């Protein structure tokens, strides 16, 4: 009987050991958070263009080659939508991407994600939420937040405060500003800064941070593909801090 008990304890020991020790985070080249604006200014058709653009990007051969081309040969990616200061929804959880199959499954998850529209635009809320997402099972040599939107922040705390806290954590903030080509009313146009200028001065930051400007939602797919390829590059190529896609 004693021998049987000892044998049982020996067999159980590895499981107990595994349960008692925290698993190390899995190494990846980049931890990338995709933060997608779903405020009221993004109408249903434009929102569909956003989701379709991200989906197409993760099916693109060049992007997949970039994912597999780093020292580790993998990235970790998560996607969430945002609007008001307190409204953020994870639509695709953290996923390791290391092959065409995993990238395509990520694209499938984007295609299946729910589409919702909310009221306000809180870029600071999006940054704060994104900053809390890192370190959840992965350890990247770079931590990057990809913020896409079509308007300035009008909800929550100052964007500058959220940005500075994120930068202090070693997070790089890149932007994808989608320009509304409809002329603003004269009064509003005089008090609201151009969106590309706003993102450049108030939103992006960190080593190698850059901004891609989509000239309308019709340019979103090409813009987001170009942006993510640049973000996941093993050694991000030097380039203009602002890049325009028409």
Which residues does each predicted region cover?
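Short beta-strand-loop
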Residues: 73-109, 186-200
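C-terminal "exit" segments of structured domains
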Residues: 212-246
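Exposed acidic/Ser/Thr-rich ligand/metal-binding surfaces
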Residues: 120-169, 246
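VWA/integrin I-like adhesion module and closely mimicked acidic/polar interface patches used
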Residues: 152-198
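Von Willebrand factor
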Residues: 26-91, 104-143, 145-148, 175-187, 194, ...
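N-terminal export signals
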Residues: 5-23
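Second-shell loop/turn segments in exported
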Residues: 35-45, 110-120, 149-153, 189, ...
